[in-house]
Amino acid sequence: MVGASANFDTMITPVVVDALRLRWFVPPEVGETVRWGLSWNVDSPRRWAVAEPAWVSTAEVRTSSKPLKWRLPRDGSDIREPVQPAIGRVGALQFMFDAEPPVPSRIDAAGALQLCAGTPRDGTNARQAWTDFDENASTTGVVRRLRLMSLESDMLPDPKFPHGPSWGWATRQFVPGSERFYELARAPRALRSYQLTDREWGPRREDFLLVDLETAS
């Protein structure tokens, strides 16, 4: 069960690895101890809800040493808002996320975490990932399970932005009910992404590596 394990001193967390990170970093193996840089964002419960619907973790929060960033607000206006890189921690599990000031003392993380930095293959992008990540936010854990997660996505109205019956923002989102899971003995060399129709910006199917990461609770 994700969030707990047979050993009550440990917990299992779902981690999503996309095609880009699988190219940048050495693929994980079951039973291997890894040191990873992980991230979470406020869209994770919606984006990765199918990965492990039951996974929720309350994390204590501290401010990262990384500088303040700016983003476009969710109401669709063009006035940028500040966000503070922050670190969530649950036992030995840590992850980075962007917090709206003031930085909260706790957050409820759900959906899944994402791999941002791992053991680099040859390449400047992989090494740069650790430069961009807060070194004090890394997590060391054991890989307990590997699965291939295949999801369909399409351009759909974005609930984060205002819209009407004939206008509004559309963003690429996962199609509910399209998910497929396959148990893996080892990680694939690459992950697929392919168009399902000839329509421009039409539906696509994309593969992800889903890792059960065990850490001390």
Predicted segments, located by residue:
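Short, Lys/Arg-enriched N-terminal segments with co-localized hydrophobic residues
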Residues: 2-10
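Short, structured beta-strand/loop micro-motifs enriched in basic residues and often containing a Trp
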Residues: 9-20
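Short, surface-exposed secondary-structure edge patches
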Residues: 19-28
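Short, Lys/Arg- and Gly-enriched loop/turn segments at beta-strand edges
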Residues: 40-55
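Long protein-protein interaction modules used by eukaryotic assembly/scaffold proteins
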Residues: 53-217
